[in-house]
Structure formats: C-alpha cells, structure tokens
Regions:
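Serine-hydrolase catalytic-loop signature spanning alpha/beta hydrolases and amidase-signature enzymes
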Residues: 62-70
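Conserved serine/cysteine hydrolase catalytic core
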Residues: 211-271, 276-279
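Active-site loop/oxyanion-hole signature of alpha/beta-hydrolase fold enzymes
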Residues: 39-44, 73, 79-125, 132, ...
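Conserved alpha/beta-hydrolase catalytic His-Asp/Glu region
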Residues: 177-233
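Catalytic histidine-centered segment of alpha/beta-hydrolase-like enzymes
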Residues: 283-296
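Flexible "cap/lid" loop of the alpha/beta hydrolase fold
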Residues: 135-138, 144-182
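Short beta-strand-to-loop junctions in surface cap/lid or active-site-entrance loops
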Residues: 42-53
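Active-site glycine-rich loops that stabilize anionic/oxyanionic intermediates
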Residues: 52, 60-63, 127
Length: 306
C-alpha cells in the first residue's frame, strides 16, 4: 500500500538505496553528438495544459523535461505545465561547465521571457533540477510563488557523484558504432547496469545521427563535472549571503532513498524557513516514477492549497 506521510523535523523514514551493481569488465569507446543549437540559444521546453496555475518542472541528471509528461498531464486542467530541458540535456544547448548559479540564471531568463512573463510561477525540481530550482528561488524570488524540491538537499550530495561515476562512465565507454539497434545497446549496457529501469532512463538519451547512434546530452562534460553537480553553492547570492526564500516550500523525499538526510534539515530550514518536509513510502530517488499517484497528489495538494 502506498502512503503519503508528513514527517516531523528531526525524523527520517529513509534507508540507503541500492545502487546498480558495478562490473569489473570494461567498455571501450566514447560517442557523443553536440547539440545543434548555439551555446547561447534558448532552452528547449514543452508546455502541457492551459490552466491558470503555472508550474515549471526541472529534471535531474541525464533526464529531460518529457520525463514528467505523465505527472504534468495528471495534474489536471487547472494547470499549465512547462517541461524544461536543462542545459547540456535533451534538446537544449551544450555548455562547457556546470555552475548552479549560471544554470539557475539561465532558467530564470527562460521563465521571465515566457511562462513567468505575467508574474511568478510555481517551480518543481528533481535531484540536479532540484538544486537548480532552489538556487533559482533564492536568486530570483520574484519569479517563484511556491517551490517543490524532490529528493535532494542544499548540501553536497556524494550519492549522486558515486552512482553517476559508474553510470556515465558506462555510457562513455560504450562503442555505439557497434550497435544496429537499441536492443543491442541495452544488452551491452546490461552487463554493467543491471537495473532495467535505470538502463531505460539512460538509453532514452540515445539518438541516431548520420546513421549512427550517439548520446544527445553532453555526457563527457557532465562526467568531468560530477563533483560540481554534487555540490551546492554557498553563498547562493554572494551579494546578499543571508538571503532566504520566504515562500511555501514542499520538500519531498523517497523513503528508500538516501539523498535526503537528517543533517540536511538545518540548512534547508535556514534557506527556506517555510519548508514542509514529506516522505513517500516505497519510493526511491525517482519517487515520481516509483509512486506517481502519491507524487501527483502531493504536488496538486500543495499547489492548490490556500
């Protein structure tokens, strides 16, 4: 049975998530394809719905906006949802580094020119996208009404670095020229990434270019900057280091994930004094995929509350 449970400050209904098993075998080659968009081109995004409540979704590392298509549709007719591809992901342009302040400012400019042109919007971010969302809310509070942070905290996240060293390393070493189909690529990846859902998540980024497979995200650059991806800027706003985001914040955590820990609570409450922390049972780091009904219910309830 799925339960959606608030947990009081100082408690944690979490246990360590089992990472995909690592293989001793090695792969061989790097195949990536640069985004066709200039590095300063607009971010790619998709809108779903035409409701009065506006919310933007930011995905995690190796994700893309369309990962949230299901939840966006389930929110209902009251919502307009924008699914944004972060830089170096999906159809958005590539860059040469990872800097959360720069990414947040770029997403803010995208929102200011579109979804948030007429006023603040709600913002939801998962994992890496959750860090971007927190930084954006602190740097551009005029753009954000309510904030939802999914299974990440405003601190260093060693879990992300450890897990994605293996996953991105596997992607980069695959000889994509050797595969004639996605099934063949999946079989090769299965020797190193045993979880079929994780493989599906990674292989969504495989594209045919000039008759050959290539990775659409900027995998090599992201791999080189995993330490920065796992970090969190401090201060977020150098010119105003004491700034907080004093709007309602929903902090979702998967009960079977270890990305949110008790020691993260003081910093989260310091930056976001109106935060409410909630855990979702039987859910890991990708809780929107593990428990979609509970996820959508939580998001809708939070965004429609008076």
């Amino acid at each position: 049975m799925t339960l959606f449970l608030p947990i009081s400050e100082g408690q944690c209904d979490c246990k360590a998530a089992e990472a995909p098993a690592r293989s001793r075998a090695s792969l061989s080659r790097v195949n990536t394809t640069a985004s066709s968009a200039p590095s300063d081109a607009p971010l790619a995004s998709t809108r779903i719905g035409e409701g009065s409540r506006r919310v933007a979704f930011l995905h995690g590392l190796m994700g893309r906006g369309r990962n949230f298509t299901g939840p966006a549709k389930e929110l209902g007719d009251d919502f307009t949802v924008e699914l944004i591809d972060l830089p170096d992901h999906g159809a958005s342009p590539w860059t040469d580094r990872v800097d959360y302040r720069e990414i947040a400012d770029r997403v803010a400019a995208h929102l200011r020119a579109g979804l948030a042109a007429d006023g603040p919007v709600h913002l939801l971010g998962h994992s890496m996208g959750g860090k971007v969302a927190m930084v954006l809310a602190l740097r551009h509070p005029d753009l954000v009404d309510r904030l939802i942070v999914e299974d990440i905290s405003p601190r260093v996240s060693p879990q992300a670095t450890d897990e994605f060293v293996h996953l991105l390393g596997t992607m980069l070493r695959m000889d994509l020229d050797a595969y004639d189909s996605r099934a063949e690529a999946d079989a090769a990846m299965a020797e190193h990434v045993h979880d079929v859902r994780v493989r599906g998540f990674l292989l969504q980024n495989l594209r045919r270019t000039g008759g050959h497979f290539a990775w659409q995200p900027n995998v090599a650059m992201l791999f080189e900057h995993l330490r920065e991806i796992g970090s969190f800027p401090d201060p977020v706003v150098p010119e105003d280091p004491e700034r907080v985001f004093d709007h309602p914040v929903l902090w979702l955590a998967g009960a079977e994930s270890d990305y949110v820990q008790d020691e993260d609570v003081p910093r989260m409450k310091e930056l976001f004094p109106r935060v409410v922390r909630v855990t979702v049972r039987d859910a890991g780091h990708w809780l929107h995929a593990d428990q979609p009904e509970a996820f959508v219910s939580a998001v809708r309830t939070f965004l429609t509350a008076d």
